[in-house]
Amino acid sequence: MTAKTYQDITVGEAPDLVSIAITNPPDKTVYKLNEYFDRTGMLVTATFADGKSRIVSGYSVSPNGALGKTDTTITVSYTRKGITKTATQAITVVYLTSIVISNPPTYTEYYEGNSFNKAGMVVTAIYSNDATKILSDTDYTVTPEILMMKMTSVTISYTENGVTATTTQAVKVNY
């Protein structure tokens, strides 16, 4: 003989969402221009009207595309029962701001029809966070390639992540 027992269970309504907080920041907070935000390591904790808190997933982040020069924070949004709460995470987007000739080329005087010689020239890239990087002579371009009379400078150009920086180098072109 089998007996079955039934018990009434009353299920209360889930408590309302009160707030969210980023309780552990993401592993990465510094990005290159056009990189995407990486959530790895980030923990988002929601607090509810009953005073309880729990780590949640299913949150969204904005911007959710490639990071730009003006992005300084990521907004995290979490919605439950039609209530949305947000929190922000500071980030840094590093991008190329300029280039400088930190050591001039060995040769600055040419004859018409000569090509510019990069020998001895050191070009340094400068970034939005004041970091610098010495460029190899294959990283940048020099225009024009062939030097003509009355030219007084050449243009040095370097492009990184869609940002181009230029500077000039004085030259003297003889007959």
Regions found by a protein language model. Give the residues of each.
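Serine/threonine-rich, repeat-prone extracellular segments and beta-strand-based repeat modules
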Residues: M1-G12, K28-T29, G51-K85, I91, ...
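Extracellular interdomain linker/stem segments of modular secreted and single-pass surface proteins
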Residues: G12-V18, V93-I99, V173-Y175
